[in-house]
Amino acid sequence: MVDVGDKTTTRRRAVAAGTFHTTTKVIDLLRESALPKGDVLATARIAGIMAAKRTDALIPLCHQLALSAVDVDFTVADDHIDILATVETAGKTGVEMEALTAVAIAGLTL
């Protein structure tokens, strides 16, 4: 793991995006709140946030970070759902991996 001990603590922010492709039928069910597993967007949002907080356990050689904010947002279109994760911290290393992990796990949860 890279030694970041001598780096200066600064505000850090990363944004990652992804797209979940599906059918119009699934999107219609989602919009009607008729999916059998309930509110999938809320579940995927929570999964993405939890994943960002656990990135160091999921990705080898990632530093454990105290995150100050994690937001996972969705934009629902006719045949896909766009996922946008924003992660912030005040630390010695960036939060890019945490943002990417949030998007990946939110997408898998969908």
Regions flagged by a language model, labelled:
Residues 1-41, 46-63, 68-109:
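C-terminal binding/interaction regions
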